[in-house]
C-alpha cells in the first residue's frame, strides 16, 4: 500500500509541475535564428552600421535590422 501511495504522490507532483515553466516557442526560434545569423555574419565579414541599411562587408548580402545583419533566408 505504501508503494501505491508513493506512486500517486509522484504522479500528482509531476502533473502539477507541468504548467509551472511555460516555454515560448517564438522566443526559442528567435534565439536560434539570431545564433545562425551571427554565424553567417561572421562567415561573410558583415557589419551592421545603420538600421534598415545594407550591412557592410565583402560578399555580404544582409540588411541591418535590430542591430544585427539579417540575411534574406533568415
Swiss-Prot record:
Propeptide segment residues: 26-42
Tissue: Expressed by the venom duct.
Keyword hit for Ligase: no
Changes after translation: Contains 3 disulfide bonds.
GO molecular function, one term: toxin activity
Annotated compartments: Secreted
Annotated signal sequence range: 1-25
Any one of the GO CC terms: extracellular region
Main location: secreted
Keywords tagged on the record: Disulfide bond, Ion channel impairing toxin, Neurotoxin, Secreted, Signal, Toxin
Domain free text: The cysteine framework is IX (C-C-C-C-C-C).
Similarity comment: Belongs to the conopeptide P-like superfamily.
Function: Acts as a neurotoxin by inhibiting an ion channel.
Name this protein carries in UniProt: Turripeptide OL08
Organism name: Iotyrris olangoensis
Amino acid at each position: 500500500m505504501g508503494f501505491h501511495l508513493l506512486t500517486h504522490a509522484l504522479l500528482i507532483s509531476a502533473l502539477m509541475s507541468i504548467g509551472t515553466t511555460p516555454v515560448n516557442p517564438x522566443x526559442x526560434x528567435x534565439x536560434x535564428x539570431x545564433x545562425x545569423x551571427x554565424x553567417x555574419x561572421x562567415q561573410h565579414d558583415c557589419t551592421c552600421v545603420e538600421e534598415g541599411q545594407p550591412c557592410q562587408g565583402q560578399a555580404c548580402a544582409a540588411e541591418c535590422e535590430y542591430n544585427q545583419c539579417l540575411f534574406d533566408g533568415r
